[in-house]
């Protein structure tokens, strides 16, 4: 009985076709994909946070402003900077991540709600070029790493014309360094390549 096939060849082919969900993804520069997405979907809603809504153009323009401010702080000598982002979940967190990717760098997410000891261990291990924080956040990082900390709000308030930084992110570069829970000891950084973000775009 186990060897009896309940479906004929046509039905097997139909099931196989219905479940063909693989998609060929382009090996593209993530920053360029972000820019193309913003142009294609400009006025459409990209981020909603509470009762606030931001279009793709709004988020892209803000990310370009932040990327420009970060570049001004780091200088042009460092092509792939490491930026720790310690921001609450909000539109500014999305903007910060996009800004770092546009800059050709990679980000290290830090949850401001996590214990200060965990955040200190991560910062000690990853040694970021900049720690992006909030003006309102009285964080231990500001006290421990005052020279590296930079508030995102002044960057967002900057006026002028800020275009795409045109920093290419190649497949062998890093996009993010995410730390494990550290349940077996110290948190360990897990590198993620830009290709892991392409399906989201």
Model-found features: residue ranges?
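Short, intrinsically disordered, charge-balanced linker/junction segments flanking boundaries
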Residues: 197-201
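N-terminal leader/auxiliary helical segments
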Residues: 11-12
């Amino acid at each position: 009985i186990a060897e009896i096939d309940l479906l004929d060849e046509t039905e097997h082919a139909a099931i196989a076709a219905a479940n063909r969900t693989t998609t060929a993804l382009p090996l593209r520069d993530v920053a360029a994909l972000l820019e193309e997405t913003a142009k294609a979907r400009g006025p459409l809603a990209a981020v909603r946070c509470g009762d606030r809504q931001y279009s793709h153009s709004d988020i892209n323009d803000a990310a370009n402003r932040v990327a420009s401010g970060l570049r001004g702080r780091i200088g042009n000598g460092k092509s792939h900077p490491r930026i720790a982002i310690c921001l609450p979940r909000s539109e500014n967190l999305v903007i910060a991540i996009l800004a770092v990717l546009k800059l050709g760098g990679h980000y290290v997410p830090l949850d401001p709600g996590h214990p200060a000891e965990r955040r200190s261990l991560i910062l000690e291990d990853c040694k970021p070029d900049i720690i992006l924080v909030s003006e309102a956040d009285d964080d231990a990082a500001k006290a421990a790493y005052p020279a590296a900390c930079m508030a995102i709000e002044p960057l967002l308030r900057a006026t002028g014309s800020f275009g795409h930084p045109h920093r290419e992110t190649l497949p062998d570069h890093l996009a993010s360094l995410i730390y494990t829970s550290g349940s077996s000891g110290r948190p360990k950084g897990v590198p993620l390549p830009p290709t892991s973000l392409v399906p989201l775009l």
